[in-house]
């Protein structure tokens, strides 16, 4: 099963989403020190004035998980979602390199985003343990407290 590889970009200085959709990666040209986001349409250069004021550390790239919430919204790293299993709680989506998977962090416990569950009289099936995107760690950090 494949999923689209795409990112969204948070500008930490301006505290807003960088005005580009579906960034696939951030590229640094080491010869000219120019930064650009690579998109399906080609490179999207970052203005030199932006580069001089923070460079790579200014941006947070958050990858699409390939999953949608109950409202059909895409779920990205950094999103805060409502967890419905084993109990209702808010959790942050993050990428875990050790398991090479997206996970949920709630109350300092890492949870899988999908679990196997058997409903009486039916075969076991994969089900999401989240319901909907509540916000994200940049604009709504209070949702995790």
Which residues does each PLM region occupy?
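Secondary-structure transition motif
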Residues: 1-145
